[in-house]
Amino acid sequence: MTKGTSSFGKRRNKTHTLCRRCGRSSYHIQKSKCAQCGYPAAKLRSYHWSVKAKRRKTTGTGRMRHLKIVRRRFRNGFKEGKPTPKKAVASS
């Protein structure tokens, strides 16, 4: 048996299928682990040696439905309640 080019044509079973968390076809069926996001691990798979991959998946690349509101509130000092009434200017 050879282990090179001729044996690659005989491979016909899928090793990976769709991942439920990241949606990529990186979920290894026998290992029961995603090669992309690390599912079923609680934390997302990310490494410092792949800076470009971190840039693709980091905070700010998606909707940020809640965080963009928090960012705006942070700039204004997390003000709450009614706005302060304007002081009447005395005309002289």
From Swiss-Prot:
Cofactor binding note from Swiss-Prot or TrEMBL: Binds 1 zinc ion per subunit.
Any GO molecular function: zinc ion binding
Pfam families linked to this entry: Ribosomal_L37e (PF01907)
Family indicated by similarity: Belongs to the eukaryotic ribosomal protein eL37 family.
Zinc fingers typed C4-type, residue spans: 19-37
Native source species: Spodoptera frugiperda
NCBIfam families linked to this entry: PRK04179.1
Cofactor: Zn(2+)
Gene3D superfamilies: 2.20.25.30
TM helices/strands, residue ranges: none
GO cellular component: cytosolic large ribosomal subunit
Record carries keyword rRNA-binding: yes
Entry superkingdom: Eukaryota
Name of the protein in its database record: Large ribosomal subunit protein eL37
Single biological process term from Gene Ontology: translation
Gene that encodes it: RpL37
Record function comment: Binds to the 23S rRNA.
UniProt KW Nucleus keyword: no
Higher taxonomy: Eukaryota, Metazoa, Ecdysozoa, Arthropoda, Hexapoda
Alphabetic keyword roster: Metal-binding, Ribonucleoprotein, Ribosomal protein, RNA-binding, rRNA-binding, Zinc, Zinc-finger
PROSITE patterns attached to this UniProt entry: RIBOSOMAL_L37E
Ligand binding (Zn(2+)): 19, 22, 34, 37
